[in-house]
Amino acid sequence: MDTRPIGFLDSGVGGLTVVCELIRQLPHEKIVYIGDSARAPYGPRPKKQIKEYTWELVNFLLTQNVKMIVFACNTATAVAWEEVKAALDIPVLGVVLPGASAAIKSTTKGQVGVIGTPMTVASDIYRKKIQLLAPSIQVRSLACPKFVPIVESNEMCSSIAKKIVYDSLAPLVGKIDTLVLGCTHYPLLRPIIQNVMGPSVKLIDSGAECVRDISVLLNYFDINGNYHQKAVKHRFFTTANPEIFQEIASIWLKQKINVEHVTL
């Protein structure tokens, strides 16, 4: 038994979609979450800067005595995950491979779409992972840089959000049977995305898929938490306004949480 928390990092609130699934599947595990909303989005930033910011988040989580770090951010996974994984002596998990694997299982026509931040799409990481495992699958990637600001400003239900999503996804409509939400912010726009793409297109939440791998690693390294612990205290940190973060988090997690401000 290992009662240390699992650390989650993201550029903002998007990683809460992963946390929500982890709380559902592994309610006995403690969580420490850091969202860098003050510097979001990461997608348009240079690689060097994304690496620098990611390491700051990692180092913060290490001060919290975490037993595992989850990159609940596709951009950070694409740019810095391999480097961090090689440098640390605790398990470090990203969201890309679980999402790619789920897309391969889902597609029936071999036509997969991937939407993400400009950096995630430019890295071509999803296409590489998918075609490494299933070379015959055609992958269409599309950067959606306006999605993260919508979520970070809590405007997911606005008419502007609907128009932006509709206009952004137009190039993929009718051309794919599976769509990877290659940014953990995007599931917060899922109803609009599904409506635009149509009911026949399967949406893959890369973050939710990641939780299955978390469970496997906890077992493999024998670091599961206390299964009998009922009241688990999580900690949430943000580099921006805690009230805005708390508002979004409480809606998504369906519980009121306390959010602490941190300066990196």
Curated annotation (Swiss-Prot):
- Enumerate the active-site residues: 73 (proton donor/acceptor), 183 (proton donor/acceptor)
- S-S bonds: none
According to the UniProt record, what class of enzyme is this?
A: isomerase
Q: Name one Pfam family in it.
A: Asp_Glu_race
Q: Which reaction does it catalyse?
A: L-glutamate = D-glutamate
Which InterPro entries is this protein grouped with? Asp/Glu/hydantoin_racemase, Asp/Glu_race, Asp/Glu_racemase_AS_2, Glu_race
Q: Which GO BP terms, alphabetically?
A: cell wall organization; peptidoglycan biosynthetic process; regulation of cell shape
Which keywords does UniProt give here?
A: Cell shape, Cell wall biogenesis/degradation, Isomerase, Peptidoglycan synthesis
Keyword Acetylation among record annotations: no
Gene Ontology molecular-function annotations: glutamate racemase activity
The cross-references to Gene3D superfamilies, in alphabetical order and at most eight, read:
3.40.50.1860
Q: What is its EC number?
A: 5.1.1.3
Q: Note the PROSITE patterns from the entry.
A: ASP_GLU_RACEMASE_2
Which residues participate in substrate binding? 10-11, 42-43, 74-75, 184-185
Q: In which pathway does it act?
A: Cell wall biogenesis; peptidoglycan biosynthesis
Q: Which purpose does this protein serve, as stated in its record?
A: Provides the (R)-glutamate required for cell wall biosynthesis.
Q: Which family does it belong to?
A: Belongs to the aspartate/glutamate racemases family.
Q: What is this protein called?
A: Glutamate racemase
